[in-house]
């Protein structure tokens, strides 16, 4: 495995995080879908750019596929039947990825101000709990939305329209 992938990914994120901070209004939310293995690098890059890490929302995708390889198959191809049997329940890779972290950042509002003041000035900064409860009934940082056939598009990691709507309603008027 390439041990530099994580650091290279952080450098990539750093290449645009500052620009996002520049164009957003104070108090604006920014949601990043980050893989479980690299979410920490996104958090570091965005904090270093000046964002505030507000929360992590857990999205239960429900229908994620297990892609972990059975190690016994490797031994079978090697004609090593003893180890194939010995390790038949063992896998290489990750668990079924039903959880995807959604990282929630905000652009800081002006020093000396408050979120209440920022809401009046920019219309953003707080969140709408009642709208969020339509998607996460207990109002917590966990959401279950399944991809529909109509959500499939040209991007390999396209997200469900309902999920995007939930995030928009959470953070904007």
Model-predicted regions and their roles:
Residues 1-13, 17-21, 31-32, 37-173:
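Class I S-adenosyl-L-methionine
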């Amino acid at each position: 495995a390439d041990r530099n992938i994580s650091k290279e990914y952080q450098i990539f994120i750093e290449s645009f995080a500052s620009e996002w901070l520049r164009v957003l209004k104070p108090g604006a939310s920014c949601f990043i879908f980050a893989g479980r293995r690299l979410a920490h690098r996104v958090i570091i890059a965005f904090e270093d750019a000046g964002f505030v890490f507000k929360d992590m929302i857990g999205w239960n995708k429900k229908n994620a596929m297990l892609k972990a390889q059975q190690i016994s198959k490797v031994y079978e191809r090697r004609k090593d039947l003893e180890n194939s049997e010995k390790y038949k329940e063992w896998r290489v890779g990750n668990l079924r990825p039903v959880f995807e972290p959604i990282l929630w950042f905000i652009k800081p509002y002006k020093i000396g101000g408050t979120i209440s003041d920022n809401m009046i000035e920019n219309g953003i900064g707080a969140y709408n709990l009642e709208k969020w409860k339509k998607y996460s009934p207990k109002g917590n940082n966990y959401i279950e939305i399944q991809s529909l056939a109509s959500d499939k598009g040209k991007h390999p990691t396209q997200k469900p329209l309902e999920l995007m709507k939930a995030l928009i309603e959470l953070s904007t008027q």
